[in-house]
Amino acid sequence: HFTSTCRSCESGDLMRFPVKRGMTESGRSMVEMLGVLAIIGVLSVGGIAGYSKAMTKFKINKSMDQISMLVANIRTLFSGQRNYSGLNNTNAIAFGIIPGEMDGGGSVITNAFSGNVTISTATVNSNADAAFTIKYEGLGQEACVTMATSDWGSGSSSGLVSMSVSNTAADGTTYSGSDLPITLINAASKCSCSTAVCSLKWTYL
């Protein structure tokens, strides 16, 4: 659409040339569209970050529930036994004390973070198989710190002997007695993995 615009109004001479209105409107629309896309991009990134954080918290809570359940199930199953002899991943699955969602088939047990879970026995005060251990691998720093500093019980009544914290899959620093629950400073220092390779191990009577 074209209109005429006055070029010069002196001496009564009118010189007119066509102006296309749609050009400025189109440019403004493009800028507005880019602005909207930028806002959508920011919101999308924020939404993904928020979802990821929420999922991490969900998995942490799930893992803590699973560990509590495993401890209770193992202690109940072996309550009439002299010790925990024979307890391992394969038998734990066969005895039905592993939640179905953790059963990876065969002797494989996985946690909510898709890391390996290892159930074994431990020697306490020179008594073989007097305790059992549950090891969680594949933990990120946040999960490691949160779970390490949680109150898993202390004293003989709780049955918790010790906890081991590591920034790798290998066993790390062990805390027991008055060092439990593990302090935030110690947990942050030991859960120093930059990727999800931290691990925790609980030893219970």
Annotate the PLM regions:
Residues S79-L205:
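Periplasmic/extracellular, small/polar-rich flexible segments of pilin-like filament-forming proteins
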Residues R16-K59, S63-Q66:
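N-terminal single-pass transmembrane signal-anchor helix
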Residues C6-C9:
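Cysteine-centered motifs
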Residues A49-N89, F95:
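Membrane-proximal N-terminal amphipathic helix
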